[in-house]
């Protein structure tokens, strides 16, 4: 089963990296049993809930990724892959030049949100966003 947004751990990592909470389109909050629940509204619409943490859907994560990156006068375009191997379907994101060289490529993930999360972390850590 594919995730629909970042996990609590991933959301906390994105906050640590300084990703703007206004880019999140969902939020995690505590319910009356102190269990995390996912709310399909931006965190700004969850003012009445306790202990809110923003969450990013795949769409929100993709929206953070630049269409291309210029590095050393080489243009790297955003690419995404869905492939199959002996482990089943896998997802990957990266930035690739027209000369088939990669600036960065994520690991292969069974869940597309996990691949997008790794890409956002790399982009932020390398000051590309």
Q: Where on the chain are the PLM-derived regions?
A:
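Glycine-rich anion-binding surface patch
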Residues: 1-129
């Amino acid at each position: 089963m594919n995730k629909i947004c970042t996990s609590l751990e991933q959301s906390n990592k994105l906050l640590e990296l300084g990703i703007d909470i206004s880019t999140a389109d969902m939020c995690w909050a505590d319910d009356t049993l102190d269990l995390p629940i996912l709310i399909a509204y931006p965190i700004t619409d969850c003012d009445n809930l306790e202990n809110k943490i923003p969450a990013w859907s795949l769409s929100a994560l993709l929206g953070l990724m630049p269409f291309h990156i210029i590095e050393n006068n080489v243009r790297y375009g955003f690419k995404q892959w869905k492939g199959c191997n002996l482990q089943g379907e896998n997802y990957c994101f990266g930035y690739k030049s027209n000369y088939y060289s990669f600036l960065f490529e994520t690991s292969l993930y069974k869940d597309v949100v996990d691949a997008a999360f790794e890409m956002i972390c790399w982009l932020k850590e390398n000051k590309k966003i």
